[in-house]
């Protein structure tokens, strides 16, 4: 069969007209260099700050440096398989992590992936790790307490729901112990907890998880772990991931407590990333925005109004306020609270619990230094009975420390000074508390009432804690109705006081 030229041209024209090409537009670049988990990517246009980039092998990275002709990105996870010339795709999405009640009782990494070997987490929702903190209009003042179960904290530096209270001290002073005790004491308090472990040994995190399981605390706790063996990028994003998981409860009219253990290691990880990205170093080689690193995280902890909750849930939850309470931990070097990161976080938070090495070594645990520990907003949230009974405790301790230092040089002391020293010695002893043994409000009220009214004054110091424990058990056995009344009303009225005095007097007679 032969075709003439006109037929051939008609055939070609019809083919061209009927040609359909499926064109897909894709923002793609090429890896120029890979060093220590940092990649430089050339050819990516329209990339957002913090956008997720997709590398070969189902690996993702975060775009952190947006420069004129390249993008500096940090790889989340393993980067050994990424080589120069590999294609990189922009996803157009900001990093999100799974949120919701499905995560409760699980141990996850900074990306919300389970690492506890208990199978997948079928979370229905995800949320961005970087979010804007609630505005002033949507906040409410702190007025409800977070009971830690520690006498020295609840009496001297009370914490309220929605507060940010810093726990600061040298290594091995019991910072994590205070935080873990606070989590254990939330059992039955209608509070969800998130424990974020940053840059710690995997064995240390496993110990904390085991203790939480032993005390039944994993029933309301999520553990986010970025271990020391993980990349700096994972340690940097872990607190933001944990915060997003906590905000899920806050924005739905529930209460949550988040512990960042510790933010010093997050600052180190961020410093490492920034130096590798060739950002100019500042004080202590930290980048210029290290204050913003922590302020944007800690400002997300707040108590939000019922209007915020109603708006967020589209009217499903009405008349309930939500809160996210943060307990960030900072590790100091040789007690230097004037270093860069400690001063930053002190200025951001609503108070600090300072743990002292000397007190810890002297056996006073928790080793809280009453002189420089403070809670700027917690007083308004303190339980009524504890507030009423704890007034003189802090002053007694602070004055005792000063007098004790002075008394070392003075040979003869007047009666008033000797009396004050004796009282200070007893109050110091009574503030001691074993780990994983948080006290109820009623137990605390019994101890504080007894110490304020001189019932411990004639008990020898070594026997004080045994006397205190015996007294608490005796009151519970002899007058359970009074204990229940204190627990429910959170107050000690004149009638309750009369009953308590009678029981304490009875106990003192039987105590030998």
Swiss-Prot record:
Record site feature (Required for activity), residues: 373
EC number: 7.1.2.2
Cellular component, GO, one term: proton-transporting ATP synthase complex
Top-rank taxon: Bacteria
GO molecular function terms listed in the Swiss-Prot or TrEMBL record: ADP binding; ATP binding; proton-transporting ATP synthase activity, rotational mechanism
Reactions this protein catalyses: ATP + H2O + 4 H(+)(in) = ADP + phosphate + 5 H(+)(out)
SUPFAM superfamilies attached to this UniProt entry: C-terminal domain of alpha and beta subunits of F1 ATP synthase (SSF47917), N-terminal domain of alpha and beta subunits of F1 ATP synthase (SSF50615), P-loop containing nucleoside triphosphate hydrolases (SSF52540)
Keyword rRNA processing (UniProt): no
Family, similarity comment: Belongs to the ATPase alpha/beta chains family.
Function of the molecule: Produces ATP from ADP in the presence of a proton gradient across the membrane. The alpha chain is a regulatory subunit.
Subunit structure as annotated in this protein's UniProt entry: F-type ATPases have 2 components, CF(1) - the catalytic core - and CF(0) - the membrane proton channel. CF(1) has five subunits: alpha(3), beta(3), gamma(1), delta(1), epsilon(1). CF(0) has three main subunits: a(1), b(2) and c(9-12). The alpha and beta chains form an alternating ring which encloses part of the gamma chain. CF(1) is attached to CF(0) by a central stalk formed by the gamma and epsilon chains, while a peripheral stalk is formed by the delta and b chains.
Name of the protein: ATP synthase subunit alpha
Record organism: Aromatoleum aromaticum (strain DSM 19018 / LMG 30748 / EbN1) (Azoarcus sp. (strain EbN1))
């Amino acid at each position: 069969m032969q075709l003439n030229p006109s037929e051939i041209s008609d055939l070609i024209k019809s083919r061209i007209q009927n040609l359909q090409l499926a064109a897909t537009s894709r923002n793609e670049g090429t890896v120029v260099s890979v060093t220590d988990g940092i990649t430089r990517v050339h050819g990516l246009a329209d990339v957002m700050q913090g956008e997720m980039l997709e590398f070969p092998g189902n690996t993702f990275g975060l775009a952190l440096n947006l420069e004129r002709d390249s993008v500096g990105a940090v790889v989340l996870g393993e980067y050994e398989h990424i080589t120069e010339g590999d294609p990189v795709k922009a996803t157009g999405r900001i990093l999100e992590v799974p949120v919701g009640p499905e995560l409760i009782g699980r141990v996850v990494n900074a990306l919300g992936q389970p690492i506890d070997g208990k199978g997948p987490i079928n979370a229905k929702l995800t949320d961005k790790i970087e979010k804007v903190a609630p505005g002033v209009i949507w906040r409410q003042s702190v007025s409800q307490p977070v009971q830690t179960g520690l006498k020295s904290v609840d009496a001297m530096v009370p914490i309220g729901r929605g507060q940010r209270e810093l726990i600061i001290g040298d290594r091995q002073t019991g910072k994590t112990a205070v935080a873990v005790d606070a989590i254990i004491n939330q059992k039955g308090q209608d509070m969800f907890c998130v424990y974020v472990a940053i840059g710690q040994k995997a064995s240390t995190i496993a110990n904390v998880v085991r203790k939480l399981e032993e005390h039944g605390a994993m029933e309301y706790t999520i553990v986010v772990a970025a271990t020391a063996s993980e990349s700096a990028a994972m340690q940097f994003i872990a607190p933001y991931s944990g915060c997003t998981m906590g905000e899920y409860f806050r924005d739905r009219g529930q209460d949550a407590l988040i512990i960042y253990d510790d933010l010093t290691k997050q600052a180190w990880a961020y410093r490492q990333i920034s130096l590798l990205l060739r950002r100019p170093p500042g004080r202590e080689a930290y980048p210029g925005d290290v204050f913003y690193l922590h302020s944007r995280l800690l400002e997300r902890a707040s108590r939000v109004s019922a209007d915020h909750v109603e708006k967020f849930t589209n009217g499903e939850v009405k008349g309930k306020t939500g809160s996210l309470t943060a307990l960030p931990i900072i590790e100091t070097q040789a007690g230097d609270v004037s270093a860069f990161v400690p001063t930053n976080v002190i200025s951001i938070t609503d108070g600090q619990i300072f743990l002292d090495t000397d007190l810890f070594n002297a056996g006073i645990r928790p080793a809280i230094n009453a002189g420089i520990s403070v809670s700027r907003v917690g007083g308004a949230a303190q339980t009524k009975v504890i507030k009423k009974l704890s007034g003189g405790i802090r002053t007694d301790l602070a004055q005792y420390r000063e007098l004790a230092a002075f008394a070392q040089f003075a040979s003869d002391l007047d009666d008033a000074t000797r009396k004050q020293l004796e009282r200070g010695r007893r109050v110091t002893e009574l503030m001691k508390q074993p780990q994983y043994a948080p006290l109820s409000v009623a137990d605390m009220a019994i101890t504080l009432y007894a110490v304020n009214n001189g019932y411990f004054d004639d008990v020898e110091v070594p026997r004080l804690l045994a006397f205190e424990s015996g007294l608490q058990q005796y009151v519970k056995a002899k007058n359970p109705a009074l204990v229940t009344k204190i627990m429910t009303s959170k107050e000690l009225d004149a009638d309750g006081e009369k009953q308590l005095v009678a029981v304490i007097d009875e106990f003192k007679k039987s105590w030998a």
